[in-house]
């Protein structure tokens, strides 16, 4: 056991984490050259394209160190994006050490800081590594100083490498052996193994990635999941080198995969503890949480007969992504669809993209919303995640909205812009800290405002330099009202929004004028109105298309012309009574582009 090292790599998006992992695998001979593809551990196409890691992957590598001993290095790849922070904390809890990979030309970013604090809280040894030192813009001394200022760990003499060209990779491996402690644990104690990740395989069902903390797990053992109390039998055990290699047993300190007869991911929850039925552990390992959805959106098929296909597709995605929640919902405007819950906006985009790409679906997505707590006058408390389900204003005592604490790292010259943006979004400043050339701002922001377009705005006001990390803080009472959009006198439920009273009139006007541009002209006039309760706050008209009925009357009597015009008007009126308006997908997305000046 003293020759095992479990470690993961913490890095901001694009700081070279996956490339470094590829180099480790190549250096330790995990795959031969023929099987090396770039970003071996990022197995989904969408992960490679966006250059982000979503699911945790793993590789067990044998490394012959300079002291002549062979070490087993277990690399657990972690996602770097803020939406997947729970997956990160699970990956880190399975390790004794973490490599903090920082781009030597860009310096420290907010998500790196957040994940690094998570690691330090979990008692994981953090080893700084400077990557991309072969870039002309690299400035290792400055970045070492930044790591010390911002994160507060000793970074002088941090290992320098370039994962792309392979310089210094061996030094990094030596550093892992030297700095990261060997796992502790008792092979003879009752079994305790934490599920780091789980995914669905079409042939064997659910594959779980586990880290054995205490005890030993063997083939054909009967095991129990401690949070759901489900029991099942071990069918296969093994490790990934990234290819899967079968083993007879996994002992304390090892990381490997476990396949049982479980067919649903809901039973193998990430962070849960696995133990033996025959000799169970009394306590589960700490840190398990049920994943909560933060952002909700409606997904509707463009063709209503694709509804069942969409259900199948969502169920298949859920097999691989336990944090995706969905339930059927009916909208008058869009027909049958699903209300889905996501971890954050990136998660929503990825699910939408996977549905379109892997399952060939055509979707309409409504604007994302968050969960509100509504206290009724009767004293009852309900949760509302869909604006059209908000009860009547008369029966509501207060509405509480979710507040998040956001940590923003930004270079000094953009601080003003970022603070202005946060104030526009009703943010409350909590803290501001100068660290070298960067400033760390902490704000309490309403999640509702962040969901819309905060991330894009933040990037554009800071020219892409600001980085953001956030976590949920609490629910707070707020002056919120429901804004309805009416087309031709009918409410379109899918366009309802819950907004703050201050920005309601402005938002209503903007939305109405946006809709006027997007709804195609019909044969009759269409009124687009924004309403709060029964009060109309904005109106726009989409002008009718009309044929020139006077074209055939060269000269002639005015009464003849009047007669034709009156006849046309009467026809248009009749049309308006029976006509219905098709609202295009772009109109639903318009909600997202409305700014809050």
UniProtKB/Swiss-Prot annotation:
HAMAP family: LepA. Pfam families: EFG_C (PF00679), GTP_EFTU (PF00009), GTP_EFTU_D2 (PF03144), LepA_C (PF06421). It is a peripheral membrane protein. GTP binds at residues 14-19, 131-134. Keywords: Cell inner membrane, Cell membrane, GTP-binding, Hydrolase, Membrane, Nucleotide-binding, Protein biosynthesis. It comes from the Bacteria. InterPro entries: EF-4, EFG_III/V, EFG_V-like, EFTu-like_2, G_TR_CS, LepA_C_sf, LepA_CTD, LepA_IV. One of its GO terms (biological process) is positive regulation of translation. The keyword Ion transport does not apply. Belongs to the TRAFAC class translation factor GTPase superfamily. Classic translation factor GTPase family. LepA subfamily. One of its GO terms (molecular function) is GTPase activity. Its EC number is 3.6.5.n1. This is Elongation factor 4. It is an enzyme of class 3 (hydrolase). GO terms for cellular component: plasma membrane. Its main location: membrane. Residues 2-184 form the tr-type G domain. PANTHER family: TRANSLATION FACTOR GUF1 HOMOLOG, CHLOROPLASTIC, TRANSLATION FACTOR GUF1-RELATED. Required for accurate and efficient protein synthesis under certain stress conditions. May act as a fidelity factor of the translation reaction, by catalyzing a one-codon backward translocation of tRNAs on improperly translocated ribosomes. Back-translocation proceeds from a post-translocation (POST) complex to a pre-translocation (PRE) complex, thus giving elongation factor G a second chance to translocate the tRNAs correctly. Binds to ribosomes in a GTP-dependent manner. It is found in: Cell inner membrane. It catalyses: GTP + H2O = GDP + phosphate + H(+).
């Amino acid at each position: 056991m003293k020759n095992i090292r479990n470690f993961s790599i913490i890095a901001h998006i694009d700081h070279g984490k996956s490339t470094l992992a590829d180099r480790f695998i190549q250096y330790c001979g995990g795959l031969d050259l023929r099987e090396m593809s770039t970003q071996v551990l990022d197995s989904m196409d969408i992960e490679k394209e966006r250059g982000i890691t979503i699911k945790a992957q793993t590789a067990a590598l044998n490394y012959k160190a300079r002291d002549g001993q062979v070490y087993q290095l277990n690399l657990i790849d972690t996602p770097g994006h803020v939406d997947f922070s729970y997956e990160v904390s699970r990956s880190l809890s399975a390790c004794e050490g973490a490599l903090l990979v920082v781009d030597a030309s860009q310096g420290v970013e907010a998500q790196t800081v957040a994940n690094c604090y998570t690691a330090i809280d979990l008692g994981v040894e953090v080893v700084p590594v400077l990557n991309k030192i072969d870039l002309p813009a690299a400035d290792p001394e400055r970045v070492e100083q930044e790591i010390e200022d911002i994160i507060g760990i000793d970074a002088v003499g941090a290992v320098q490498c370039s994962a792309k060209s392979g310089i210094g990779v061996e030094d990094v491996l030596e550093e892992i052996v030297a700095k990261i402690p060997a796992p502790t644990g008792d092979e003879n104690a009752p079994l305790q193994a934490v599920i780091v990740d789980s995914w669905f395989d079409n042939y064997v069902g659910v594959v779980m990635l586990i880290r054995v903390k205490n005890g030993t797990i063997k083939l054909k053992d009967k095991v129990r999941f401690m949070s759901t109390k489900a029991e099942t039998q071990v069918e296969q055990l093994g490790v990934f080198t990234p290819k899967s290699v079968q083993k007879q047993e996994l002992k304390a300190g090892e990381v490997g995969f476990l396949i049982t007869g479980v067919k649903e991911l809901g039973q193998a929850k990430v962070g849960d503890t696995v133990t033996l039925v025959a000799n169970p552990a009394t306590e589960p390992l700490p840190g398990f949480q049920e994943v909560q959805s933060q952002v909700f959106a409606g997904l509707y098929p463009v063709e209503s007969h694709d509804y069942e296909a969409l259900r199948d597709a969502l169920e298949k995605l859920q097999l691989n992504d336990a944090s995706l929640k969905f339930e059927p919902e009916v909208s008058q405007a869009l027909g049958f669809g699903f209300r889905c819950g996501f971890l954050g906006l990136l998660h929503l985009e990825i699910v939408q993209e996977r549905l379109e790409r892997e399952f060939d679906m055509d979707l309409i997505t409504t604007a994302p919303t968050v969960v509100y707590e509504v206290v009724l006058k009767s004293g009852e408390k309900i949760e509302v995640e869909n604006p059209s389900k908000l009860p009547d204003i008369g029966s509501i005592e207060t509405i509480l909205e979710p507040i998040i604490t956001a940590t923003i790292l930004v270079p000094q010259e953009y601080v003003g812009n970022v603070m202005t943006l946060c104030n526009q979004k009703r943010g409350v400043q909590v803290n501001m800290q100068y660290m070298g050339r960067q400033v760390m701002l902490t704000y309490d922001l309403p999640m509702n405002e962040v969901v819309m377009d905060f991330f894009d705005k933040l990037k554009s006001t800071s020219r892409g330099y600001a980085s953001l990390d956030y976590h949920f803080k609490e629910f707070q009472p707020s002056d919120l009202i429901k804004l309805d959009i009416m087309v031709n006198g009918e409410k379109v439920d899918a366009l309802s929004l819950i907004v703050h009273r201050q920005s309601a009139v402005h938002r209503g006007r903007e939305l109405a004028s946006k809709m006027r541009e997007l709804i195609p002209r019909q044969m009759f006039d269409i009124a687009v109105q924004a309403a709060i309760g029964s009060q109309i706050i904005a109106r726009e008209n989409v002008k009718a298309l009309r044929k020139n009925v006077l074209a055939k009357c060269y000269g002639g009597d005015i009464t003849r012309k009047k007669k034709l015009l009156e006849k046309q008007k009467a026809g248009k009126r009749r049309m308006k009574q029976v006509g219905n308006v098709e609202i295009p997908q772009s109109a639903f997305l318009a909600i997202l582009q409305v700014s809050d000046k």
